[in-house]
Amino acid sequence: MRCTRWTVLFLGTVALTGCESGGRTGVKGTVTYAGQPLAVGTITFVPTGEKGIKCGGRIENGQYQIEPPFGPMPGPHRVEIRWTKPTGKKYKNEFGEVFDVTREGLPDKHHKQSTLTATIHAGMNVLDFNLEK
């Protein structure tokens, strides 16, 4: 019986430890391009300070949300936003499956050469990005 109590205590401690976010925060918001919600894309937060790891999430219907276990650490970040736009062409792979050919739909200034920045604070952050052409 005593072994069972220790086992339960140990497993409970392990479970609670696994729930910590490790200092990571949550972030959510909206992304628009030329005044319209970005239909589908990705957003990435790249730390510019001394600590943190690059993280990101999906944009759907102009909205994104990254929960604390997967979000950025507090501090300054460079923000990269991407959107793949269909070109109107199709591609057929060796299995006969047909796919849309896509290209990057946003100017480099919003991803590769991004000058977008954000300061992340502890807790849930709300950050909206209104991108221009």
Identify the function of each model-found stretch.
Residues 2-133:
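Glycine/proline-rich low-complexity segments that form flexible loops, beta-turns, and polyproline
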